[in-house]
């Protein structure tokens, strides 16, 4: 067994599930202290939550680098670890403007964790996304002969697999393919800002709807790219197999479609979506300004279609 294979055999997810609940509890405790105007306790609890969050991401480096083999996500996590440590230090030192961002993280975990840790909720979400992905592929006649079937893995009863007889390749919709992570981020950010409830509701409804549609399109693209081997070019095989530690050339199309193109485009799409949603919830720009200021970029962001002096720019 190679060193990479040995590292990939390590299982950290059960421990990170427990740690995630601890992190959520710490952030919620900080939010509760803030609501009770106990600023000193809020700073200490929230700073501790950020430092625990750094530990959480650090533990996940192995999973995303050697099991999931995602370059984009691994780079983001490597940035997240020192960023969480630094934000925690700033909060502890009295930078109270970061309590809004901390409140957003608390809401994100409240949205995300029940789906991630509940087998029933996770299964329902996966099957809903898989069914709609298969429906779009069939409706657009993009894959003649594709079979939508039950997960062949032993012990799984989920209808989440697309098999392409023409190439013998199959793709599965798993939890990471549901878009719940992005929906949790936007839901948490919008819930955390100080804005009228109606505008927040519009922002959440729009962001979740757009993310859901984009995610279905993403799954359609990945399933077809893998099923029909769209990126099976000899000049791609060497670099991609070396980058991701692959031994089977038939997996190159999947990794190019998912780990490279889809994930890079997702970062761009989410940034664009945040700018779009700021039309209804311009308070999101305050969080963006705060994040930029952490890295030494002091700017004042203005959405071109929003008057920041208006109390309800959605009207």
Curated annotation (Swiss-Prot):
Instruction: Name the InterPro entries for this protein.
Output: ArtA (IPR014522), Exo/Archaeosortase_dom (IPR026392)
Record-level GO BP terms: proteolysis
**What is this protein's name?**
Archaeosortase A
What the record says about family reads: Belongs to the exosortase/archaeosortase family. Archaeosortase A subfamily.
Q: What membrane topology does the annotation report for this chain?
A: Multi-pass membrane protein
Could you name the Gene Ontology cellular component terms for this entry? plasma membrane
* Residues that span the membrane, as ranges: 12-32, 47-67, 74-94, 173-193, 204-224, 227-247, 260-280
Where, subcellularly, is it found? Cell membrane
Q: Which UniProt keywords apply?
A: Cell membrane, Hydrolase, Membrane, Protease, Transmembrane, Transmembrane helix
> Where primarily located?
membrane
């Amino acid at each position: 067994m190679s060193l990479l294979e040995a590292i990939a055999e390590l299982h950290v997810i059960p421990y990170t599930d427990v740690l995630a609940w601890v992190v959520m509890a710490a952030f919620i405790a900080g939010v509760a202290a803030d609501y009770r105007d106990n600023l000193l306790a809020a700073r200490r609890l929230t700073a501790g939550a950020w430092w625990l969050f750094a530990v959480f991401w650090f533990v996940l480096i192995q999973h995303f680098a050697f099991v999931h083999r995602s370059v984009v996500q691994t780079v983001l996590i490597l940035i997240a670890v020192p960023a969480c440590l630094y934000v925690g230090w700033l909060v502890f030192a009295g930078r109270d403007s970061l309590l809004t961002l901390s409140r957003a993280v608390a809401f994100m975990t409240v949205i995300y964790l029940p789906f991630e840790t509940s087998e029933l909720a996770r299964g329902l979400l996966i099957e809903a996304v898989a069914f709609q992905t298969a429906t779009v592929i069939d409706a657009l006649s993009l894959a003649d002969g594709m079979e939508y079937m039950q997960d062949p893995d032993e012990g799984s009863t989920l209808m989440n697999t697309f098999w392409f007889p023409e190439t013998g390749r199959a793709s599965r919709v798993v939890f990471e393919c549901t878009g719940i992570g992005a929906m949790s981020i936007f839901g948490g950010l919008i819930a955390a800002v100080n804005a009228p409830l109606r505008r927040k509701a519009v922002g959440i409804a729009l962001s979740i709807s757009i993310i859901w549609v984009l995610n279905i399109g993403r799954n359609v693209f990945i399933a077809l790219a893998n099923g029909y081997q769209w990126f099976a070019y000899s000049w791609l095989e060497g670099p991609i197999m070396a980058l991701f530690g692959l031994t089977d050339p038939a997996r190159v199309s999947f990794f190019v479609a998912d780990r490279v193109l889809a994930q890079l485009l997702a970062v761009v799409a989410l940034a664009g979506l945040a700018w779009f949603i700021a039309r209804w919830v311009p308070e999101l720009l305050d969080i963006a300004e705060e994040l930029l200021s952490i890295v030494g970029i002091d700017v004042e962001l203005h959405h071109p279609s929003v008057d920041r002096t208006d109390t309800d720019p959605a009207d």
